[in-house]
Amino acid sequence: KRNTRAYEFQKGPANQKSFGCIAATHKNLSGKDAAATKMAAKGTCVMALMTGEQYVESMRKLNLQVYMFGKKIENPVDDPILRPSLNSVKATYDLAQDPEYADLMTAKSILTGETINRFTHIHQSTDDLIKKVKMQRLCGQKTAACFQRCVGMDAFNAVYSTTYETDEKYGTHYHENFKKFLQYVQEHDYTVDGAMTDPKGDRSLPPHLQADPDLYLRVVERRPDGIVVRGAKAHQTGFVNSHEVIVMPTQAMGEDDKDYAVAFAVPTDAKGIFMIVGRQSCDTRKLEGSEIDVGNSQFGGTEALVIFDDVFVPNDRIFLNGENEFAGVLVERFAGYHR
């Protein structure tokens, strides 16, 4: 199951070719996706956009290490407790295919000029920000649940500008790394989780003075071809339903915490990543065969404690690596978008 994804990850986004814009009357869409055909008739490129069902099938291909109630979940996509949360993300793909909502749910990529899901867009104007809010409101109205893509979207925009400023000061290549990663995400129409919150431990102490040095995610090895990271990210909304994750520092970092000032992206099924799913209200009611007290039976959310057990990150997926003064900048910028 991992062969294709692992190969793409090792090659890196720089070698991925653009899907381009192919007519939506292609045999794979003709007669099967009327909404996409209508959008194509209006001159809108839809070939880079997955349908909801295509998103679901793409998640089946991942080799996710998911644990819940003390057991490994072999099939997260069809698990009755997890499936409503997957349906919420699926709705963001279905709505993007609907001509009625195309103006809110899609945007033109600043990297390729092609039509993309707005959840992967870099805001360019006040109008973009207004449409972002209206899109989020629409998704909330359609699902009455958490649709799990907001953190990733806000991470894109925070990392985009922060990497540019870091490169200006240090001559690094983080901004180019990020743009290539973002183009890869847009062309594949992937869902990306944003991971910021660490377990933290004693909050009166900085990361390097914690009793356990891994209570904040950190770099434990620097190699010629990349870095190795260890630690965890807590309360990760939608990680189980994402293709990729952007990891960011959780707070401003001092000189002694350079190893904790790290930002990067990896596939959610990268070797060494483990997800421990937390409880939801009334979640086991879904297993009782009754509609009583199941809450929102069709849609939902999910959170997980995500463990990074010596995960390798190649150089072209690194967006911050020890430049500690930009950790706080990134966190503050993200908060401005997110809150």
Language model feature labels by segment:
Residues 47-109:
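Acidic/polar, glycine-rich intrinsically disordered N-terminal extensions of enzymes
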Residues 7-9, 19:
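Aromatic (phenylalanine/tyrosine) cluster motif
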Residues 232, 236-287:
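A short core secondary-structure module
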Residues 3, 15, 26-28:
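Intrinsic-disorder-associated, low-complexity terminal segments enriched in Asp/Asn/His/Tyr and depleted
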